[in-house]
Amino acid sequence: MNKYKEIFGVDISKDVFDVHGSKSGHDQFKNNALGFKSFLKSLPKESLVVMEATGYYHYRLAQFLFKQGVLVSVVNPLSVKRFIQMKLAKVKTDKSDAKAICEYGKINEVPLYTALTDVQSECLQLFRLMDSCLKKRTATKNKIHGEDVLGIPSKYVYRSLKRIKKYLDKEILGIEKKLLSLVKQEQQVQLTLLTSIPGIGIKTALFLIVITDGFDKFENAKQLCSYAGITPTIRESGSSVRGRSRISKVGNRKLRNLLFLCSFTACKHNKGCREVYERIVNKGKSKKLALIAVSNKLIKQSFAIAKSGNPYDEKYVSVLPK
């Protein structure tokens, strides 16, 4: 017999979130403060709300419900995806996803969510703001390049775009400084340890610390690799030996992208990563697959160093479970 009065599966998107109750069935709410309050009113006492870790979208609802005394579980989307595949579900909608998450919560012993600290919450907001500024800066750079290509750019337009880029450069730098200041308040040691790894830059180290709560949210490196979605998938067909390597679309996209960018530097300056890269390429595998493996290696190194408390040492052999 389930220990909760009712289990609710929640599938969250940008504007709405779909809910499936184990007894009450499907419902949908706006993904805003009013929608949160309406959902809260509909919840029976002693209920459990299960949702996927979906980048930034799930944080607000999880935080809100936790602070209202509701039991919440945030689960790995890769685990839910595999659960759906095992059920051989043919129809995929937000409504069906909410139902699948509900069923996953009923069958599995899911971990209970612990609210973020004020520092963690502010850091995530800052990362979201930085992402927005970076996209705007890239768009501005493209416009400047476009004006150059025209050959006779308008001086007013050109200067205006330059001012916008300069402003965004300043904002991004300010956000990075604020993030660094906040993380140093609670995780100075972890930050120093992670940045000792060749290939791991300050931005990636900051993000790793924030989303893992100083590596306390994951029991092993394998769980963190799954969360990032960097376990390579190779498809093989017929007599073909070499399948196409792909990074899973499931997982934390920002972390995955940061690690993939880090892998290029790590291949050159990180002995362990370079050996992994060369071994895979020498077997005739694609360079992309090798870079995915390097990203995976970086997570394992980060996890081992964070847990051991010892800085990077290229001669060190991890004894932590993989």
Predicted regions located by residue number:
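Short, solvent-exposed helix-loop connector elements
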Residues: 112-125, 153, 243-246, 275-292
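Generic structural signal for well-ordered, non-transmembrane alpha-helical segments
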Residues: 131-134, 138, 162, 166-173, ...
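Phosphate- and other anionic-substrate recognition elements at nucleic-acid/protein interfaces
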Residues: 1-155, 268
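Low-complexity, acidic/Ser/Thr- and charged residue-rich accessory regions of DNA metabolism proteins
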Residues: 239-240, 277-322
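A residue-level signal for conserved active-site and pocket-lining positions in enzyme catalytic cores
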Residues: 101, 133, 259, 284, ...
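Phosphate-backbone recognition surface of nucleic-acid-processing proteins
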Residues: 29, 38, 193, 208-283, ...
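Helix-hairpin-helix/helix-loop-helix acidic hairpins
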Residues: 148-203, 212, 270
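Short helix-capping/linker segments at secondary-structure and domain boundaries
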Residues: 108-112, 213-217, 265-272, 299-314
